[in-house]
Structures are given as structure tokens and as C-alpha cells.
Regions:
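Short glycine-/acidic-enriched loop or helix-start segments at secondary-structure transitions
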Residues: 15-16, 39-43, 47, 123, ...
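Charged helix-capping and loop-helix junction motifs
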Residues: 126-134
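Metal-dependent phosphoester-hydrolase catalytic domains
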Residues: 73-74, 138-144, 152-231
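Acidic/histidine-rich helix-loop elements
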Residues: 4-12, 81-89, 120-122
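Membrane-interface helix-coil boundary segments and nearby low-complexity
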Residues: 1-6, 225-227
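Structured beta-strand-rich core segments of catalytic domains in phosphoester-bond hydrolases
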Residues: 29-110, 114, 199, 205-208
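Active-site beta-strand/loop signature of hydrolases that rely on acidic residues for catalysis
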Residues: 4-9, 18-41, 63, 98, ...
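Structural motif corresponding to alpha-helix initiation and N-cap regions
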Residues: 12-16, 57, 187
Length: 231
């Protein structure tokens, strides 16, 4: 079993909350979005920085428990750019992943932090980004189970998205409560998880912090999800 918190820090504003979040019981990893990667510490509590994006003004990062997991490799990736990326803030890297080995069970896995294009882009672009991210993580993991957690910026038509990712062997799992409430017409589940080779046991929306997004806690067990078994 692995327990991961994902949090969009809202332009790094919520960075000071990470020390307390890292104290979450039995927490194994953190996936961050909208952080200033150059200012991230190497350690947050007992979590170690696996990797972060390098070229973004606001980037992504993955932390993991070094006593529980061994890091095999990691990499950040560019995805198809939205108009927002081309005109405004440079955000070429929207995915960072780390291949880990569970020291207890021997399982290999890929853990990734993902941030899709903003709401000014079309859902079709975000679907292309998600599909490309899944393919890149499969290459990184060489067939290892995948957890891709983050800000998908996909509050509407999620059932359609779930059907599409299922066709490629992934499960989409929302949290128990919505994760974004800043905009009246775009409240909902922005932050969630897509996975392959895991059984998602729980996705809990945690208490609100200073970000416009609310952190989520994913609890997952090793084992094929229903979409893979049915394939």
C-alpha cells in the first residue's frame, strides 16, 4: 500500500503548509504543483525530493520516503502546449515522474505529479496531454504500475474522460469531496488520480489550506484495477 498527498500550492503560496502535511500518518509521498522548484528543500520531514521540473516558472515536484522506497530513475517531461503556455507564463514541463522500488514488498512503481493546461484550453487538449503523459510514464517505468496524481483542470465531463482513459487501461478516481471552490461556475474535482496496476482504496479531500485548491490524500494498493482486468 502507498499513501500520497497531491497539492497545487497556488503560485507557491501554500509552501509553508508542507511540513505539517508531511506529518500525515503513514504518508509515503508528496506530489506538488505550482511550486517554485528552485526553492524546494531536499527534505520535507522524512520525505526526500525525487525530482522537480527545471524550466517552469511554477513547477512540479515529487517527494518520497527514502526509508521505504529506493529511487531508480526520474524525469520531467514536456507536453503539448496550450495557447496560455505560448503567450503567458512559460510552462513547458507539465509532468514529472519517478520510478521507485518498495523496499518492503519489492514492487516497482512509477509515481508522477501532473498539471494539465488551464481552463482557457479545450478539454480535447487536456485529453491529449493525459494520454501523452501516460505513454511517457509507461516508458519510464518499463511496465511498472503507475500513479499519476495532480491538477487535471477537468471539472466537467469527467465521465467521458474516465471512459477514454479506461480504453487505454487506466482508472480515473475522484476524491470524496470537491477540491476547488474558488470560481462559482467551476467548482468541483480538479485534482484527482489516474492509475494503472493499482487498486485505489481511498481518495480523501483534506482540510482547506491557503491555496485555491484543496489537497487530496490517495491510498492505493498494489494490484490490477478493473479496467485492466476487463481489457
Amino acid at each position: 500500500m502507498i499513501r500520497v498527498i497531491s497539492y497545487n500550492l497556488r503560485k507557491n503560496r501554500a509552501i509553508t503548509e508542507l511540513v505539517e502535511l508531511a506529518k500525515t500518518p503513514d504518508l509515503d509521498a508528496l506530489c506538488l504543483q505550482e511550486c517554485i522548484a528552485s526553492e524546494l528543500p531536499a527534505e520535507i520531514g522524512n520525505l526526500h525530493l525525487a525530482d522537480s521540473t527545471k524550466r517552469n516558472r511554477l513547477g512540479l515536484a515529487v517527494y518520497y520516503r527514502k526509508d521505504r522506497y529506493e529511487q531508480v530513475s526520474s524525469r520531467s517531461f514536456e507536453l503539448k502546449k496550450s495557447l496560455h503556455d505560448l503567450i503567458f507564463s512559460p510552462t513547458p514541463e507539465r509532468l514529472v515522474g519517478a520510478k521507485l522500488v518498495d523496499r518492503k514488498s519489492g514492487h516497482e512503481l512509477v509515481l508522477a505529479s501532473f498539471h494539465a493546461a488551464p481552463l482557457t484550453a479545450l478539454n480535447s487538449l487536456r485529453r491529449k496531454q493525459i494520454a501523452a503523459a501516460h505513454e511517457l510514464l509507461q516508458e519510464l517505468g518499463s511496465g511498472a504500475p503507475i500513479l499519476m496524481i495532480g491538477d487535471y483542470n477537468y471539472p466537467l465531463f469527467q465521465e467521458n474522460l474516465s471512459d477514454k482513459v479506461a480504453k487505454s487501461g487506466y482508472d480515473l478516481t475522484l476524491s470524496d469531496r470537491r477540491t476547488y471552490t474558488a470560481y462559482k461556475f467551476f467548482r468541483g474535482h480538479f485534482d484527482f488520480v489516474t492509475s494503472q496496476g493499482f487498486t485505489i482504496q481511498d481518495v480523501e479531500t483534506l482540510p482547506r489550506g491557503s491555496s485555491d485548491h484543496i489537497p487530496i490524500l490517495v491510498t492505493a494498493g498494489y494490484g490490477a484495477p478493473s479496467s485492466v482486468e476487463a481489457a
